[in-house]
Amino acid sequence: YAKYLNQNGWSLDLVSHSEERSKKAREFFQNNNKNNYYHFDLSKKDSILELLDKIDCPDLVVANAGITMMSKAGESSSLQRDELYYLLCGGVIDLIEGLVPRLKEKDASRIVIISSIGAVTPMPKSSLYASAKSGIYSYGRSIGEELANENISVTISLPGYVKTNAHRRAGLDHLERKIPFWMWVSAEKVVKMTEKASIAGKSTVIPGLAYKLVKPFLGMEITSKAWKMLNKRN
């Protein structure tokens, strides 16, 4: 998303927990000297509060936590659950809640929340991830209705399988072999479709033609069984 916005002339406030990724971002965007870079662990409340103190009020907020977690029910630790939930849901809420009073002072502004298709369909062995994404999806839809009269648009994107290295980092590299090619969506397509929907003032968007076609069947038992079969390790 940052690459797309940079190409379109935006000045960016970029936040990353990884020093290596932050360094790569600085090198990639070296021609844009208006960008700001922050190194925070967004799974911690103190980091969100410190970030809110440092940044100016943006015209566009993109909440995109690029992490996933595979965990069978009953096998995660309390710390894992707390950190994942705050990163994917609670921290996003705290960030947006902290910015909304300032956003209301602008003539117009936008909020984009990257949720997941897992927010609206069962994800066996990824229940923590899916439930956190479901929570932020519900929050986004609710504040979207509330803030519409404040000239603040809220768009929630529900991507499916996106071609990034997030699955590998989470130990889910088997998905690259199991999931049919037509179910994968490029990160570039997700960003372009999400940004188009946001500019148009749409509340939700499901990037990718395949996911649009199966949208009426999401949440049904047959869809859940197919999802479980595709995600199963050999």
Where are these regions (language model features)?
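Substrate-binding pocket helix/loop in short-chain dehydrogenase/reductase
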Residues: 72-85
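Active-site loop immediately N-terminal to the catalytic Tyr-X3-Lys motif
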Residues: 123-127
